[in-house]
């Protein structure tokens, strides 16, 4: 069982960043060495901070150097929210908000890239047992953002050009309650019991692994 102190130690690595309060003698170079990251990432995550004039007591975001989006773990609504938060810290030009709430009150989070007039919308995890589309979309988001800051390309087109031309909206988990049911995060309680009652009418579909609908049994 993971206790509160263990979670507190793990959380920065799940979100991909930590924070640091500036002390006398701190520099971005020194902080990069201290946290095993690089100066570029620290500068990018703190766009309003002058690295030549660090103010004692200022709180800095310190992104780690590893890729944030895991692709070899089962996903949940919480993990998705942590990754969205981490991406917006690492790449502060990204915008994030919620388009609404799920049946169980979870935020339906989205990311916005770009400044263009042409609007494009991608989403993932409509069907609960197709949650694998969530890390696919989040990995795309991470690669796009990294390509933008490093002058790279996406599909043969400069990411900076795509950023200027399009406003891209990504909603990585349309059905968070259903995903939590399928991946085992939701395994008891009233919502779980009602979902099981619905599933009993379809014995040919394994429960919860085969569940596609939202937690109320409505196919999205």
Protein language model features and the residues they cover:
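Active-site/substrate-binding loop(s) of hydrolase catalytic cores
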Residues: 117-118, 131-220
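Short beta-strand-to-loop junctions in surface cap/lid or active-site-entrance loops
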Residues: 109-117, 125
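Primarily a LysM-type cell-wall glycan-binding module
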Residues: 12-36, 58, 64-67
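Short hydrophobic beta-strand that contains or immediately precedes a catalytic carboxylate
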Residues: 22, 121-124
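Short acidic beta-strand-loop surface patches of small beta-rich interaction domains
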Residues: 43-50
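Short glycine- and acidic-rich boundary segments immediately preceding or forming the N-terminal edge
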Residues: 41, 63-104
């Amino acid at each position: 069982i993971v206790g509160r102190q263990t979670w507190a130690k793990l959380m920065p690595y799940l979100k991909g960043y930590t924070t640091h309060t500036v002390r006398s003698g701190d520099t971005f170079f020194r902080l990069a060495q201290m946290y095993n990251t690089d100066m570029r990432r620290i500068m990018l995550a703190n766009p309003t901070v002058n690295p030549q004039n660090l103010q004692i007591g200022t709180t800095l975001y310190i992104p780690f150097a590893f890729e944030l989006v895991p692709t070899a773990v089962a996903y949940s609504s919480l993990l998705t929210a942590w990754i969205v938060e981490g991406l917006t810290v690492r790449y502060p030009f990204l915008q994030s908000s919620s388009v609404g709430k799920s049946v169980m009150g979870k935020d339906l989070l989205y990311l916005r890239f770009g400044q263009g007039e042409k609007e494009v919308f991608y989403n993932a995890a409509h069907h609960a047992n197709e949650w694998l589309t969530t890390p696919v979309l989040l990995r795309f988001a991470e690669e796009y953002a990294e390509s933008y800051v490093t002058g790279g390309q996406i599909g043969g087109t400069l990411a900076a050009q795509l950023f200027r031309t399009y406003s891209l909206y990504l909603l990585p988990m349309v059905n968070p309650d259903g995903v939590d049911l399928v991946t085992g995060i939701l395994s008891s309680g009233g919502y779980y019991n009602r979902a099981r009652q619905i599933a009993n009418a379809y014995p040919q579909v394994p429960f919860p692994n085969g569940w596609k609908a939202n937690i109320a049994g409505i196919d999205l």
